[in-house]
Amino acid sequence: MENLHNRILEEGQALSSDVLKVDSFLNHQVDADLMYEMGTYFKNYFKDHNITKIFTIESSGIAPTVMTAMQMNLPMVILKKQGSKILKGDVYQTTVHSFTKGTDYELTLQKKYINEDDNILIIDDFLANGEAALGAARLVEGAGAKVAGIGIVIEKSFQPGPKLLEEKGYDVYSLARIEKLEKGIIKIKK
């Protein structure tokens, strides 16, 4: 996705060999036109996967997921990371380790938003170690539903997540694949 690649190279900041800051268009300030284009790419790739719902993890995956759900005319479900008095009782939960924050959290899904007939597309902003995507997949599969695919905005190809998801047999489609990060240097796989 050329527009995304350009934005990463022009506005992204490699803060270290494993941290890429893209808050000017993805996860603090959001470029709605770019999100819409991402939705188009995800829709075109996953259109024949018989998707019934699209899941994302709060919060940075929400914008591209909304645009994808709108274009595919499908319901979207936000998996919760934060505890809530409202989310009690009939829920699926799994523990996930956050690469970015270096902490664990309980990923939560209300049971009423998934059934065994669902084919779920999971969309997330980054793929690094694969923990978030695997946590979402555990919730989906724990409910007896199927992970039909995983859409990633930015994949860090040099980290273990992409290989891990591939080894588990998931169909992963990444809009941008980062080959290498060094302080001040970003190299994108073409």
UniProtKB/Swiss-Prot annotation:
Question: What is the similarity comment for this entry?
Answer: Belongs to the purine/pyrimidine phosphoribosyltransferase family. Xpt subfamily.
Q: List the SUPFAM superfamilies hit by this protein, alphabetically.
A: PRTase-like (SSF53271)
Q: Briefly, what is this protein's role? A: Converts the preformed base xanthine, a product of nucleic acid breakdown, to xanthosine 5'-monophosphate (XMP), so it can be reused for RNA or DNA synthesis.
Family annotation (NCBIfam families)? PRK09219.1, XPRTase
Gene source species: Clostridium botulinum (strain Alaska E43 / Type E3)
Its catalytic activity? XMP + diphosphate = xanthine + 5-phospho-alpha-D-ribose 1-diphosphate
- Top-rank EC class of the record's enzyme: transferase
What name appears for this protein in its UniProt entry? Xanthine phosphoribosyltransferase
Give the pathway annotation. Answer: Purine metabolism; XMP biosynthesis via salvage pathway; XMP from xanthine: step 1/1
Its keywords, alphabetically, are: Cytoplasm, Glycosyltransferase, Purine salvage, Transferase
Q: Where does 5-phospho-alpha-D-ribose 1-diphosphate bind?
A: A128, N129, G130, E131, A132
Q: What is its EC number?
A: 2.4.2.22
Annotated positions binding xanthine: L20, N27, K156
- Self-association and partners: Homodimer.
Q: Which InterPro entries does the entry mention?
A: PRibTrfase_dom, PRTase-like, Pur/Pyrimidine_PRTase, Xanthine_PRibTrfase
Extract the PANTHER family matched here.
HYPOXANTHINE/GUANINE PHOSPHORIBOSYLTRANSFERASE (PTHR43864), XANTHINE PHOSPHORIBOSYLTRANSFERASE (PTHR43864:SF1)
Major site of localization recorded for this protein: cytoplasm
GO annotation, biological process: purine ribonucleoside salvage; xanthine metabolic process; XMP salvage
